[in-house]
Amino acid sequence: RVSSAVSSLVSSGPTTPAALSNTISSAVSQISASNPGLSGCDVLVQALLEVVSALVHILGSSSVGQINYGASAQYAQMV
């Protein structure tokens, strides 16, 4: 599931705000389906851990190039 989350996040690009939401939603659905006995809280915690793992993997395999400070306002709006 983590590799699926990585693929989903990378393919949607860095400026797609819905990508993270969709990835979390997908992880929640998959975890709920494969572990019907888990509580909603447990499912959410597991999903968030998997998404954070995916983000760490992406950051770990990325290389930072030239930074466009002029576009920082656009990225700040996403947060």
From Swiss-Prot:
Segments forming a coiled coil: none
Keywords, comma-separated and alphabetical: Secreted, Silk protein
Pfam families according to UniProt: Spidroin_MaSp
InterPro entries: Spidroin_C, Spidroin_C_sf
Family in the record: Belongs to the silk fibroin family.
Domain of life: Eukaryota
UniProt free text on domains: Highly repetitive protein characterized by regions of polyalanine and glycine-rich repeating units.
Record protein name field: Spidroin-1
Subunit text: Major subunit, with spidroin 2, of the dragline silk.
Functional note: Spiders' major ampullate silk possesses unique characteristics of strength and elasticity. Fibroin consists of pseudocrystalline regions of antiparallel beta-sheet interspersed with elastic amorphous segments.
Organism annotation: Araneus bicentenarius (Giant lichen orbweaver)
Location within or outside the cell: Secreted, Extracellular space
